[in-house]
Amino acid sequence: MKILVDENMPYAETLFSQLGEVILKPGRSLTADDLVDIDALMIRSVTKVNAALISKANKLKFVGTATAGMDHVDQALLKEKGIYFTAAPGCNKVGVAEYVFSVMMVLAQQQGFSVFEQTVGIIGAGQVGSYLQQCLQGIGIKVLINDPFKQEEGDEREFTSLDRLLQEADVITLHTPITRDGKYPTHHLINEEILNSLRADQILINAARGPVVDNQALKRRLQQADGFMAALDVFEFEPEVDMELLPLLAFATPHVAGYGLEGKARGTTMIFNSYCEFIGNELRAHASDLLPTAPVPKVVLDRKWDEATLHTLTQLVYDVRRDDAQFRREIGAPGAFDLMRKEYWDRREYSAVTLVGSAQCRLKPLAKLGFQVEVSQ
């Protein structure tokens, strides 16, 4: 059995080698020839699975993507060819939410505002958007959500129209897939008209898919230099990056918002377990068994936490400035975008840290944000 695996998928070689011969290749540059005699293909979002890629896949029976998003895979084609497909929904939701929160926290420090006085507008209430909503509301931040699909499906949450959200939110964060057809297409959802309507004190964050925002229109909006800010983890034509847009961004990173070690481990184990089930193998893997201890596994608090404490705790785990600085420093080199993703550091999630404190420390909201908490006597 031959299993072709994206070389950037952590823990994959160790896990899948239990099932057959593992062949590692860079996901973005896979060709049809690479799939000759391949039984299973394990990818990430940089691999476009289409008719051209599988044209020589004479043995392919299984495709798994270790990502929540699935828009890079022609699922109808795979179904037509009798090829089983699976994804890892929700695997990266924690990492993306913590990326967004880091952007908010750092900008709050830099610009002198309180995150607790901001209204956050979440566009897209799927796995990531819903988790982010839960975290922010858990610590007392006002949230507006927009998702016409969820609303029409009968989701009981209180939804907000896109127009109202764009008017009332101080922070607008995008968590939609990329679609070009249908009732609510998201390609260039944030277009020139919308960008020009945004206030100077608003912040736009895109950690979803690059083409959800018209990058040329965003560049023109930021060139007005009126105080409006944007942070991009995804770019419209990545791995190509508009070098005129880059210096205008508050933060820029190479599509790594969901690249926390826990999220990547979850994605890999989810498709590994699906493949084991597909081939009738009883092996199963658990992400928690693969993870090392965090560099700072425990923090003791001696008083009730406040916003300054929150800055310290969250930045102890993840500070977006680290990735932003590397991105600006290295993006000019050939192949830098994918190399930074391939060599991404072992970023952890808040859950890797246990906060210890008495009942007076009121740790429960921090547990809702994702930290482990332990109430001392």
Swiss-Prot record:
Keywords linked to the UniProt accession: Cytoplasm, NAD, Oxidoreductase, Pyridoxine biosynthesis
Top-tier EC class: oxidoreductase
Chemical reaction(s) catalysed: 4-phospho-D-erythronate + NAD(+) = (R)-3-hydroxy-2-oxo-4-phosphooxybutanoate + NADH + H(+)
Ligand binding (NAD(+)): Q127, V128, D147, T176, D233, G258
EC numbers, comma separated: 1.1.1.290
GO molecular function, one term: 4-phosphoerythronate dehydrogenase activity
InterPro entries listed in its UniProt record: D-iso_2-hydroxyacid_DH_PdxB, D-isomer_2_OHA_DH_cat_dom, D-isomer_DH_CS, D-isomer_DH_NAD-bd, Erythronate-4-P_DHase, Erythronate-4-P_DHase_dimer, NAD(P)-bd_dom_sf, PdxB_dimer_sf
Active site feature: R209, E238, H255 (proton donor)
One GO term of the biological process aspect: pyridoxine biosynthetic process
One Pfam family linked to the record: DUF3410
Keyword NAD applies: yes
Cellular component aspect of the GO annotation: cytoplasm
Binding locations of substrate: S45, T67, Y259
Localization in the cell: Cytoplasm
Chief place of localization: cytoplasm
Biological or metabolic pathway of the protein: Cofactor biosynthesis; pyridoxine 5'-phosphate biosynthesis; pyridoxine 5'-phosphate from D-erythrose 4-phosphate: step 2/5
Function: Catalyzes the oxidation of erythronate-4-phosphate to 3-hydroxy-2-oxo-4-phosphonooxybutanoate.
PANTHER family, A to Z: D-ISOMER SPECIFIC 2-HYDROXYACID DEHYDROGENASE CATALYTIC DOMAIN-CONTAINING PROTEIN-RELATED, D-ISOMER SPECIFIC 2-HYDROXYACID DEHYDROGENASE FAMILY PROTEIN (AFU_ORTHOLOGUE AFUA_1G13630)
Family the UniProt entry places it in: Belongs to the D-isomer specific 2-hydroxyacid dehydrogenase family. PdxB subfamily.
Assembly, per entry: Homodimer.
The name this protein goes by in its record: Erythronate-4-phosphate dehydrogenase
Organism name: Vibrio vulnificus (strain CMCP6)
Upper classification of the organism: Bacteria, Pseudomonadati, Pseudomonadota, Gammaproteobacteria, Vibrionales
Gene: pdxB
